């Protein structure tokens, strides 16, 4: 006779009914500053009813009272089918949730904006601040005890940290990780340093159309961020240096099992953050020393020039630190910090090489004498404590302490650097960028002779003018010329808007890597001194000065002058000055009418042009900074820049002096960037 199957009793809830019912006990006030579901209740005028409504709707998703009683870890989900840098986020989400649940928390993911460089017009930088607002308000509004910020692509991690600092709830970062390199004709290639170098070969006629098409299939063979020391990888390294991401989190490839284990560990850390009685919030973790560590790492890895703008935006979100770190700080630290990492675009390796060589723990081990090891981290321990634990591991014994390690060529010791100092040079002196934000990635210069250079300026008024004239055989340019592109700053001078086409601001695009004129490229010229008020990709190389401030859209900028006639004889100048002033003021009035019209724009475009500040302040919206809307940082750059200028010289507010030539640009690295007439007179 068969026995009847054993009846399984339903599991008893871990939360006793009395505790459940307490949520509806009208005689007991609800702690609105509590944890879990009881925080940040919507306003229905009755807190008990608000909690009642919240619970009934979340239970529609199948959550039990046991689940809802746990600390809630929010997970920011930036997956998008338009964003291949974030293509592995579904797998990372599962791993983070596993870590949260194994540690006794409740993981709930929610979406925010997702930005990719190639799929946002006019540029992803234009939307970085919008993403930071989205991140801040979703963290602030929702009942989360800690938040995991999953991101990776260039503007994502800065936007998330900016928003996270402003919301000031416990946060921890998880990056998607770098992609793997590909292979083309037996040579390793990867996005996107090799994109640009090979495109330059194609423009010069050294590569045919079949090869460039075949190469396109190999440059980005997997999901993940660019596999060189571009902006995404730079910001990942800086998150570790700032203490906002665990020490092993920066370099594991996007498609590796190591990346999934890092994600699971991040979930565990997030629950620890959520359970702490004294919440470890970003404003408590981040100190001036944290930012000094980040800048040291920025210089040591030969990081992206874009990191300068992002760091300024991040620090100026912090109420206690805003204004204490400036571009001049980056320059000062660079003078005593060597470049240790041999990765493209400053060197030859890829992020997979960096990871195999020990990643950030190995690099920080070499940098110990230059770091503030007492800086706090998101784990609750100091950077020194984290580093002591990491360097004791087998991995570090293999890669750092072994004198025979072949990977030592990737991470150099302080005594044998790739570049002695100032991988990133910030021009704090000179009249071309009195805002003090102009930056040059000296370590990525292809012709070091250009670091001390004097040449005639060839000026382009925006991307359309550049595209129209750069390859014109009649262009008056030679290998010693200085290519200048203006009108691509934070606001920019949008050609469509000026033509009445309704275009918006430029958004500071990555157009600063001005292509070598084709007729010079065909002669073997691979680098020229180039200057712009825009940005360039962190994966790019060349002798390129970026972020000139004030930008060309500002009539007071040296780059902002629109028509040029420089008279070399003083008596001629005196005789014609009044006539020219009247003529140019009439022309400028017409231009300023267009400018005023842009300031009346509706929607996000209007918000952007009215509120965005300049590069030295982070290209953030003034009302989002810690100082708030009453402290517009647009005009503080010259005060911060300091430096030597001729006695009695004041930065000009010129409306009537400009020309494509004969302006002369003088670059004296790492000190001075000036614009003069052919006789050497400063404008």
Which stretches of residues belong to each language-model region?
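Short, well-structured alpha-helical segments in soluble
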Residues: 130-142
